[in-house]
Design a protein with these regions (language model features):
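Active-site core segments that coordinate phosphate-bearing ligands/cofactors
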Residues: 1-172
Length: 172
């Protein structure tokens, strides 16, 4: 997010920095939400759970066969080391509510994306505590934002509008 006033999270759960548009006359501070491990969860599911050789679009189609809520399966996506937004705790990734008689690869694919969405929501709540009102998410048309499941869940859970741009993080 970009903020027009000087503030920060006292627990350093998000990173505040001078935005490229910042000047002495106009305060423009960026606030960066770092969620360590969320993208890697989706790629881990693709490599280790989904059928071999599956593409990301096909993985999204597989996940779409499962209803919202993954029939009670949930995944906390923090499996790539300490999490800044969790005060540098290493909580690891965990799967909850797994029922061997109900859940399959499709459920895991959907639950992973839903877990990532809720980690975003948690981080956005931190930003809201700082006075940043997030009504629009502007993102590159890349990575998880290519997934309709992810986009729809993120918009629904956060109450935001998602605007996609023909760019990716490499462009800046």
């Amino acid at each position: 997010g970009v903020n027009g006033k000087v503030n920060y999270d006292t627990l350093s759960r998000v990173n505040t920095f001078a935005h490229v548009n910042h000047s002495a006359d106009q305060t423009r501070l960026g606030v960066l939400l770092c969620i360590n491990g969320v993208g890697i969860l989706n790629s881990w599911v693709k490599r280790n759970v989904a059928p071999e050789g599956i593409s990301y679009p096909a993985l999204n189609e597989l996940a779409a066969t499962v209803p919202i809520g993954s029939e009670g399966l949930s995944i906390l996506p923090f499996g790539n080391g300490a999490e800044r937004m969790l005060q540098n705790k290493q909580v690891d990734c965990s799967i909850h509510g797994l029922n061997f008689n109900i859940h399959n690869k499709a459920h895991i694919a959907r639950a992973a994306q839903e877990g990532i969405v809720f980690s975003f929501k948690y981080g956005m709540d931190i930003m809201n505590e700082m006075g940043i009102d997030i009504g629009v998410i502007r993102a590159g048309n890349a990575n998880l934002f290519l997934s309709p499941i992810f986009r729809d869940a993120l918009a629904g859970v956060t109450g935001t509008v998602i605007e996609l741009y023909d760019t990716n993080g490499a462009v800046g």
